[in-house]
Amino acid sequence: MDINQESLELHYQMHGKIEVVSRKKIETRKDLSLLYTPGVAEPCRQIAKDYEKSFELTRRNNLVAVITDGTAVLGLGDIGPAAGMPVMEGKCALFKEFADVDAFPICINSKDVDTIVNTIYMISQSFGGINLEDIAAPRCFEIERRLKELCDIPVFHDDQHGTAIVVAAALINACKVTGKKLGKLRIVINGAGAAGIAIGKLLISMGFGNIIMCDIHGIILSLIHISEPTRPY
């Protein structure tokens, strides 16, 4: 059985890769009164008086929203939000297994930047962080920029920053192994999308100077050779 078929059968068996589990068993009437009404009113009052207490009195301190519009899912492309759900669930499972961070998959059925930004902003007070995932360029740049301005919690675009961090780490270690200097390397970035641009920005900030970036038309020699929507980035 190949890996695709094996994965499909596993997904049929599991009916999803994540679940919500109560951190306190509700076994008695007092448990119910403490975790829900009437006792829960007091934490609500405290948060109403001091917004920051929402990070102390709720699980918000450890909740991350993993959000996509389904337009750039893995190597599959624009397959829609529902079809992107298995990937979002998988990312949430990684958060939990490797960092003990509770993450929720959220798939937004819109390609409109304003709608996506407003939707995420309106639910942001339920979370401690936002992880943008598999949103096509150049729309992803604008969404991230605006959310960072609006939200009071960290906003991270995995396809940009996660990829850039991994590439930078690999190059640093490669330099250690080969004894070469960071600024002496000649680097080719094959692709000028979300990941490629983010990689270029990070490497330049770290002192890597000799960088050649290519897109579907070949080597990019000036801004004229970059597609109009991507130029500002």
Question: Where in the sequence are the language-model features?
Answer:
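Glycine-rich adenosine-cofactor-binding loop
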Residues: 65-75, 167, 183-204
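Conserved acidic E/D residue at the C-terminus of a beta-strand in Rossmann-like folds
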Residues: 213-215, 228
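A glycine-rich, Thr/Ser-enriched phosphate-binding loop motif common to dinucleotide/cofactor-binding enzymes
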Residues: 157-173
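Single conserved hydrophobic/aromatic residue that forms the stacking wall/gate
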Residues: 224-233
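Conserved S-adenosyl-L-methionine
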Residues: 205-209
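N-terminal ligand-binding/catalytic initiation module
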Residues: 1-155
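A generic local secondary-structure boundary/capping motif
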Residues: 52-56, 120, 177-178, 199-203
